[in-house]
């Protein structure tokens, strides 16, 4: 199992509001919201990701979570630093 898929496995039940808090702690800011519930977050170094947000307690599907994690470029060490993984 590679690091990306293991990170998805560890974060598969993470509520969206906790993922958004971690994005903001990592320096991402809300660029804009779409009419369909998507929130576009951007980092000063040029990374951009879209998080679909309807209810804070919702979780993302594994495929969507993997896409977000690939876009932000987090590793397991980053997830630990941001408090997502013990």
Language-model segments: residues:
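Basic nucleic-acid-binding interfaces
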Residues: 1-86
């Amino acid at each position: 199992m590679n690091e990306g898929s293991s990170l998805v496995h560890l974060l598969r039940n993470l509520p969206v509001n906790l993922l958004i808090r971690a994005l903001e702690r990592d320096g991402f800011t809300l660029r804009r919201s779409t009419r369909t519930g998507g929130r576009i977050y951007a980092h000063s170094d040029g990374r951009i990701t879209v998080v679909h947000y309807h209810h804070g307690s919702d979780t993302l599907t594994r495929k969507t979570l993997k896409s977000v994690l690939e876009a932000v470029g987090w590793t397991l060490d980053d997830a630990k630093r941001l408090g997502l993984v013990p």
